[in-house]
Design a protein with these regions (language model features):
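Beta-propeller blade termini and top-face loops
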Residues: 1-217
Length: 217
C-alpha cells in the first residue's frame, strides 16, 4: 500500500492506492486503486491497474467522489500510466490531468485544505536498473494548479526566478499548511540550493529554510 485517504465529508469512504510510494530496488508493485464505502469492511477495485505504484491520494473536502491520485508508475522502465490522475465519479473513470513524459512520475501532491482545486505536485524523473538508480534531474519540477488539474504551472526550473531551485532537483515532497493555505513547503535534494523551501504567498515566491541534506525526501 502506497497511499490511503479517508473522505473528510464521509469517514465511511476510504480510498487506497497500491504499490510502494518509494522507488527502492525491492519495492512492491500494486494493481491500482481500491475503494470502501463502509469503513473498510468491503473493498472494490476501481482502476488504474497499470499504475504500479501510487504515492499519495487527495480527496476533495466536500465531495467524496472527487479524488486525485499521485502515481509513481513503473520503476524499471518508462510507462504512460504515471503522473496525476483525477476521478469525479468515485473511481468509475479516471483522467490523467498532469503528465510530463514516460520517465517522470508524481512523487507527492498536496491541496489547499479549503479548496482542493488548488493543488501542488512534485513531478520526479527516475528509473531503476539492477545496478543503478537514476533519480531526479531531467524534468523533475514543482507544479501548481488552481482549477482542479485542468491546467498546471511549472514553478521550478532554470527559467524561473522565484526562490525555488533553478538547478536539478531530486524526489520532491510538497505540503500545504492546514492552518494557512498560503503557506506551502517543498522538500527535495539539490547540490547547492538547499533542501527545504517555504512560500508564504501560495507559491508566488519561496525562500530556503533548511539546507541540511539529512532531511531529503
Amino acid at each position: 500500500i502506497g497511499a490511503i485517504a479517508v473522505a473528510p465529508s464521509d469517514p465511511n469512504v476510504v480510498y487506497v492506492g497500491t504499490g510502494e510510494g518509494n522507488p527502492r530496488n525491492n519495492a512492491s508493485v500494486g494493481d491500482g486503486m481500491y475503494k470502501s464505502i463502509d469503513g473498510g469492511e468491503h473493498w472494490t477495485h476501481i482502476g488504474l491497474t497499470k499504475s504500479d505504484k501510487i504515492a499519495r491520494l487527495i480527496i476533495d473536502g466536500r465531495n467524496a467522489d472527487v479524488v486525485y491520485a499521485c502515481v509513481l508508475g513503473r520503476e524499471w522502465g518508462p510507462n504512460e500510466d504515471r503522473g496525476v490522475f483525477k476521478t469525479t465519479d468515485g473511481g468509475a473513470t479516471w483522467k490523467k490531468v498532469l503528465y510530463v513524459d514516460p520517465n517522470t512520475a508524481c512523487s507527492d501532491i498536496s491541496a489547499d485544505p479549503d479548496n482542493s482545486n488548488i493543488l501542488y505536485a512534485g513531478m520526479y524523473t527516475y528509473r531503476r536498473w539492477a545496478w543503478h538508480l537514476e533519480s531526479g534531474a531531467g524534468n523533475t519540477a514543482v507544479y501548481k494548479s488552481v482549477n482542479g488539474g485542468a491546467s498546471w504551472e511549472r514553478l521550478s526550473g532554470p527559467d524561473k526566478v522565484n526562490g525555488l531551485p533553478r538547478t536539478a532537483m531530486d524526489r520532491i515532497g510538497v505540503a500545504v499548511a492546514p492552518s494557512d493555505p498560503n503557506i506551502v513547503y517543498v522538500l527535495s535534494e539539490t547540490k547547492t540550493e538547499g533542501e527545504l523551501w517555504r512560500s508564504d504567498d501560495a507559491g508566488k515566491s519561496w525562500r530556503t529554510v533548511n539546507r541540511d541534506p539529512n532531511i531529503n525526501f
